[in-house]
Every structure is written in structure tokens, then in C-alpha cells.
């Protein structure tokens, strides 16, 4: 594949759409539309676990793009520094933790958007006073509920959420829905 030309066909406040003209291996021209982010560089997706109970911290968040709620991992945009995952976790869930592992920069949804993200694994000590009664620090535009899920019940929990009309993030289904089948 060889890029021939690229033009912006929509230029919004946060997102844009590009049309890119490619030449295929066979020499044919192919047009592709892609969404791009205008202000963010690398986001974080947070896998947070309460210790010692080993429950996962998930969120239920309203998303206008789907006009509904999605069960997902806490996440944030525009942070090159993985340490910002701690700030994002505190804002979205009220919990404070420590970073245990950070992935390299990964792509998410490369067929449609140019998103980059790191997966940040955080452990949250349930015994700390700050984690006894966590208080979220949400922005006005955020509608987020915190969900604590035991790993052994996670798949059933996700299926129950679907039956209630909520959506499930694909990365959660990978973690809890099929991971046991491929482990």
C-alpha cells in the first residue's frame, strides 16, 4: 500500500476526518476515511485492582456517541506521562493507587481512528484511609458510576449489564469474556 494523497474533509473542535487516497499492491486507487484526534497524543487505559480483595475497578459511563452507558475501564486522553493514570483514576473513581506496570504505546481501533494509548496496571490498597470512602472528582460533562467486580463473577456481570441495555467495552470482554478460553 502506498499513500498518494490526503485531505481533511471535516475539521471539528476535538476530532477531524481525513480522506486518504492509497494505491493498492495491484495498482488500484482506494479511498479511506479516518478519524483523527486534534489535541491528544497518548491516552491511558487503566486496569485497576483493589488489593487484597482482587476486585477490579470498572466504570459505567454515559457516552453521547452511543447515546447510552458503557461498562469500561477508567481511561483518559492526552497524557504522554503514564503517571497521569493515577490522576485519572482518582478523578473518575476516587481511588488512589500505585502503578505496577505500563504497556508500550498501543493502537486501539486503527481501522477507523489514529488513537494511541498505554495500558496502565494499578494496584489500589483497600486498607489506606484514602480508599475507605473514595470521592470522585468528575468534570461537569462526565456521568460516571464506579463498579467493583470480582474476577470470578466478571463475565456474568458483563452479561447482566448487556441484558439491562448497557454496552460493554471490547477490551473488557477480552479480559473477562474470552480470556479463560485462550489462556
Regions inferred by a protein language model and the residue ranges of each:
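Short, solvent-exposed loop/turn elements at beta->coil junctions and helix N-caps
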Residues: 7-8, 104-109
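Active-site-adjacent beta-strand/loop module that shapes the phosphate/pyrophosphate-binding cleft
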Residues: 21-26, 52, 109-131
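Conserved hydrophobic "DFG−1" position in protein kinase catalytic cores
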Residues: 22, 48, 58, 121-122, ...
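The catalytic Nudix box helix
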Residues: 72-105, 120-122, 138-141, 150
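Conserved Nudix-box catalytic region and its N-terminal flanking loop in Nudix hydrolases
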Residues: 35-47, 52-87, 111, 129-140, ...
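Nudix hydrolase/Nudix homology domain
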Residues: 1, 65-70, 74, 112-113, ...
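Short beta-strand micro-motifs in enzyme catalytic cores
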Residues: 16-20, 42-44, 69, 116-120, ...
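Acidic, metal-coordinating catalytic segment for phosphate/diphosphate chemistry
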Residues: 5-46, 51-52
Amino acid at each position: 500500500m502506498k499513500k498518494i494523497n490526503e485531505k481533511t474533509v471535516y475539521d471539528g473542535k476535538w476530532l477531524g476526518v481525513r480522506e486518504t487516497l492509497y494505491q493498492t499492491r495491484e495498482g488500484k486507487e482506494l479511498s479511506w476515511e479516518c478519524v483523527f484526534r486534534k489535541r491528544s497524543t497518548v491516552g491511558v487505559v487503566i486496569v485497576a485492582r483493589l488489593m487484597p480483595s482482587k476486585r477490579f475497578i470498572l466504570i459505567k459511563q454515559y457516552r453521547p456517541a452511543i447515546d447510552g452507558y458503557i461498562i469500561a475501564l477508567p481511561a483518559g486522553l492526552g497524557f504522554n506521562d503514564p503517571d497521569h493514570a493515577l490522576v485519572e483514576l482518582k478523578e473518575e473513581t476516587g481511588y488512589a493507587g500505585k502503578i505496577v506496570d505500563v504497556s508500550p504505546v498501543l493502537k486501539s481501533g486503527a481501522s477507523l481512528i489514529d488513537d494511541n494509548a498505554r495500558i496502565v496496571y494499578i494496584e489500589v490498597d483497600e486498607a489506606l484511609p484514602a480508599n475507605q470512602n473514595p470521592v470522585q472528582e468528575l468534570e461537569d460533562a462526565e456521568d460516571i458510576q464506579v463498579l467493583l467486580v470480582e474476577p470470578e463473577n466478571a463475565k456474568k456481570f458483563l452479561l447482566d449489564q448487556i441484558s439491562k441495555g448497557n454496552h460493554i467495552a471490547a477490551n473488557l470482554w477480552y479480559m473477562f469474556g474470552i480470556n479463560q478460553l485462550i489462556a
